[in-house]
């Protein structure tokens, strides 16, 4: 950051702090602490992603009575800011809030958090709104802006998948997680499984269409966005594989999958950058895609 931009950021953060003190004159200590942590996590004076210290604290509120207030406060800050970095940090925070449920417990875990998620995504409509961002304040913001715009659309897609699947797409490489999900999918009708696959493929397409990496290799905000996205990619592979295997058991030749498989293969090159992160998972998945296509 340049000296002028840094000074401007400091003044904005101090103004936000003063406003917070006035707003919370009659509020509870917990409400003020949440808003203060949000300001610290999304400060104007740093080009780094939200600090783990504040992220962990904000995540800890999600399963409490303050959870909706936390999500609503992040959404409000996202809507009113014109700062590209602050908007990026708000989106990262929202992504982490959604992913923060403890373990994978199927539909019940999502049902407990439904009020939090529906603050962001309700009945097909997204509450993720970007303000008119000050794009040209620096080279850093010019590089970051296309990522912020893409990431907002990506989160819309991610949340719509949670709506259709009935679970947050955050399944890990655990036998119990896969057993629970396989059991759920086995009870679904064919058209339901095909619809879910369509939405998962859309996530693949969004990942494949991400912006080019910034020339500044040390853009830690983009690195954080990418890391969260890759985690989602691996979860989506596990979810899709379970559905492909279920269809493979039910029908000899699932013709309805042909267009979907072609879309997937069109994404393959754009996703190859991440193959080294989980070679066996990736290789097994693309082998299954080829096998289904050749049936």
From Swiss-Prot:
Keywords, comma-separated and alphabetical: Coated pit, Cytoplasmic vesicle, Endocytosis, Golgi apparatus, Membrane
TM spans (from-to): none
Major localisation: membrane
Cellular component terms per the entry's GO annotation: clathrin-coated pit; clathrin-coated vesicle; Golgi apparatus
Pfam family name, one: ANTH
Alphabetical list of CDD domains matching this protein: ANTH_N_AP180_plant
UniProt lineage: Eukaryota, Viridiplantae, Streptophyta, Embryophyta, Tracheophyta
Molecular function as annotated in GO: phospholipid binding
InterPro entries per the UniProt record, alphabetical: ANTH_dom, ANTH_N_plant, AP180-like, ENTH, ENTH_VHS
Localization in the cell: Membrane, Clathrin-coated pit; Golgi apparatus; Cytoplasmic vesicle, Clathrin-coated vesicle
Signal peptide limits: none
Name of protein: Putative clathrin assembly protein At5g65370
Source organism per UniProt: Arabidopsis thaliana (Mouse-ear cress)
Positions of the ENTH domain: 26-169
GO biological process: clathrin coat assembly; clathrin-dependent endocytosis
């Amino acid at each position: 950051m340049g000296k002028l931009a840094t000074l401007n950021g400091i003044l904005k953060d101090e103004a936000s702090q003063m406003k917070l003190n006035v707003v919370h004159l009659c509020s509870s200590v917990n409400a003020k602490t949440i808003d203060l942590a949000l300001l610290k996590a999304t400060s104007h004076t740093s080009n780094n992603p939200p600090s783990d210290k504040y992220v962990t604290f904000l995540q800890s509120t999600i399963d409490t009575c303050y959870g909706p207030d936390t999500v609503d406060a992040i959404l409000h800050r996202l809507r009113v800011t014109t700062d590209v970095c602050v908007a990026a940090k708000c989106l990262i925070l929202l992504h982490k809030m959604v992913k923060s449920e403890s373990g994978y417990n199927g539909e019940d875990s999502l049902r407990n958090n439904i009020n939090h998620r529906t603050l962001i995504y309700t009945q097909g409509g997204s509450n993720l709104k970007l303000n008119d961002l000050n794009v040209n304040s620096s080279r850093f913001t010019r590089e970051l802006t296309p990522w912020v715009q893409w990431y907002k659309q990506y989160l819309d897609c991610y949340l719509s998948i949670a709506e259709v699947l009935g679970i947050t797409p955050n399944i890990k490489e655990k036998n119990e997680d896969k057993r629970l999900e396989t059991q759920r999918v086995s009870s679904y009708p064919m058209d339901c499984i095909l619809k879910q696959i369509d939405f998962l493929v859309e996530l693949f397409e969004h990942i494949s269409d991400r912006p080019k990496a910034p020339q500044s290799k040390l853009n830690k905000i983009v690195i954080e966005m990418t890391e969260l996205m890759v985690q989602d990619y691996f979860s989506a592979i596990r979810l899709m594989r379970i559905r492909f295997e279920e269809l493979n058991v039910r029908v000899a030749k699932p013709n309805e999958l042909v267009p979907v498989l072609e879309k997937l293969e069109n994404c393959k090159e754009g996703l190859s950058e991440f193959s080294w992160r989980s070679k066996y998972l990736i290789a097994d998945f693309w082998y299954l895609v080829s096998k289904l296509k050749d049936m």
